[in-house]
Amino acid sequence: MTDHTPALQRPATRTARLSAIEQALLTRIVTSQSQLSQILADQGIEVTQATLSRDLDEIHATKTRLADGTVAYAVGKQNIDEHPASNPDAKTEQQISRVLSGLVTSVAAARNLVVVHTPSGAAQYVASVIDKQPIEGVLGTIAGDDTVMVICSEDDVAKRRAQWLLDVASKA
């Protein structure tokens, strides 16, 4: 499957660098700081080993042994077999399903957008959950009080993501 997500343009800030590091650890199996440094360099982010080490500490990244014995960096609390890059679709769906099953009241695609309605006050939480997951073709979200707009890279991606969100939200 080809990733239709355009490369993100990131400002040269510490916050953007931390975000790029976290996203790399969520979407790939990263086994060394030099590998992570190269991933960041490919995105136009130059970082020293000392800075990278401090950044990994700051985002609470840890080295975890995966089921196949590989030692890789991970962020957040993850079980030994559950590095997100090992099975991104199942892991993403499971995490999102827990939240969306009780909070999504309707979903619709409109061009390259997916409009998600929630109960009053829940939209920002739903958007945050979507933003934290590596979902192919999703560029980001905007949330109000009871509505989330999911911005997709293309119209057909929005249609697929709308159906996927509806399916995931329907699981109880």
UniProtKB/Swiss-Prot annotation:
The keyword Cell wall biogenesis/degradation does not apply. It comes from the Bacteria. Its main location: cytoplasm. Keywords: Amino-acid biosynthesis, Arginine biosynthesis, Cytoplasm, DNA-binding, Repressor, Transcription, Transcription regulation. GO terms for cellular component: cytoplasm. Pathway: Amino-acid biosynthesis; L-arginine biosynthesis [regulation]. GO terms for biological process: L-arginine biosynthetic process; protein complex oligomerization; regulation of arginine biosynthetic process. It is found in: Cytoplasm. One of its GO terms (molecular function) is DNA binding. Regulates arginine biosynthesis genes. Belongs to the ArgR family. PANTHER family: ARGININE REPRESSOR. This is Arginine repressor. The gene is argR.
